[in-house]
């Protein structure tokens, strides 16, 4: 992908364990950290379909990391680089690196779960966005972990048109490294209902109407102290293509 006004070049910061992790920025104004989903990257999730531009145009500095194992970030194969909650720790390292104190935070799918884990661990953004995520995907990560392990260990064997086949096709589109993704799955951490109930950050729960990959978004909104549900068209893969995704995030962040 060539650098252009809509494809900003990556910057890099060091993780706590010394890896070089990439992030991109668009816009000026209030900082918003947006985290992408599994097999994706910051460009694909947030820039490619115009979401980052819509939000930046509303007066935000949109900061989009590539998770370890993804995009232009380091992608080690050694399982020791993927301890529990490492993605939340990386998010915290980025916030420290940029010196952010008053900011907003969100993500899609795995990025939404990572945002939630950061909240549990003490992050205090003004507002949070949990998109492409439901209650089951927060309480019990094992189901999705098992699905993606099946995808990664069966590459080239999945039935055409199946969910696993489509996930593999997406991985190939983004150039993901299966040998880095596999140990990353073991870093997923479950969150309890009690932990959810203690979160008082206003949170947008944003999900496609046909997306039940991670369980019920409505139940996730109910489980949070200040969860606000918004549904848009699409399923887990196609909701990202909808302009309503970026517009809904913008509207939530700019509301009084």
Predicted feature descriptions by range:
Residues 19-74:
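Conserved HGGG/HGGXW glycine-rich cap/lid loop of the alpha/beta-hydrolase fold
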Residues 53-57, 64-104:
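Active-site loop/oxyanion-hole signature of alpha/beta-hydrolase fold enzymes
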Residues 105-107, 131:
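Short beta-strand immediately N-terminal to the catalytic nucleophile in serine-hydrolase-like folds
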Residues 113-156:
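Flexible "cap/lid" loop of the alpha/beta hydrolase fold
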Residues 168-191:
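Hydrophobic, aromatic-rich cap/lid helix
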Residues 199, 205-207:
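Short beta-strand/loop motif that positions the catalytic acidic residue
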Residues 207-235:
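Conserved loop-alpha-helix segment in the C-terminal half of the alpha/beta-hydrolase fold
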Residues 235-247:
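Catalytic histidine-centered segment of alpha/beta-hydrolase-like enzymes
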């Amino acid at each position: 992908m060539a650098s252009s006004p809509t494809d900003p070049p990556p910057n890099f910061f060091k993780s706590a364990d010394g890896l070089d992790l990439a992030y991109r920025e668009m816009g000026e104004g209030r900082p918003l950290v947006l985290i992408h989903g599994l097999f994706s990257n910051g460009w694909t999730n947030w820039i490619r379909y115009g979401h980052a531009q819509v939000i930046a145009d509303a007066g935000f500095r949109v900061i989009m990391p590539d998770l370890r194992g993804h995009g232009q970030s380091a992608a080690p194969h050694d399982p020791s680089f993927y301890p529990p909650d490492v993605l939340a720790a990386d998010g915290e390292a980025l916030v420290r690196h940029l010196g952010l104190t008053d900011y907003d935070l969100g993500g899609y799918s795995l990025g939404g779960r990572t945002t939630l884990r950061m909240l549990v661990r003490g992050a205090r953004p003004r507002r949070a966005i949990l998109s492409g995520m439901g209650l089951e995907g927060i309480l019990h990560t094992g189901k999705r972990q098992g699905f993606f392990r099946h995808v990664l260990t069966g590459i080239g064997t999945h039935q055409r048109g199946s969910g696993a086949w489509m996930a593999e096709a997406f991985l190939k589109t983004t150039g993901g490294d299966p040998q880095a993704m596999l140990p990353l799955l073991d870093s997923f951490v479950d969150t309890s209902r009690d932990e959810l109930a203690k979160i008082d950050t206003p949170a947008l729960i944003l999900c496609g109407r046909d997306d039940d990959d991670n369980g019920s978004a409505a139940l996730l909104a109910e489980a949070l102290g200040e969860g606000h549900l918004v549904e848009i068209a699409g399923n887990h893969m196609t909701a990202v293509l909808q302009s309503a995704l970026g517009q809904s995030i913008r509207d939530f962040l700019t509301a009084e």
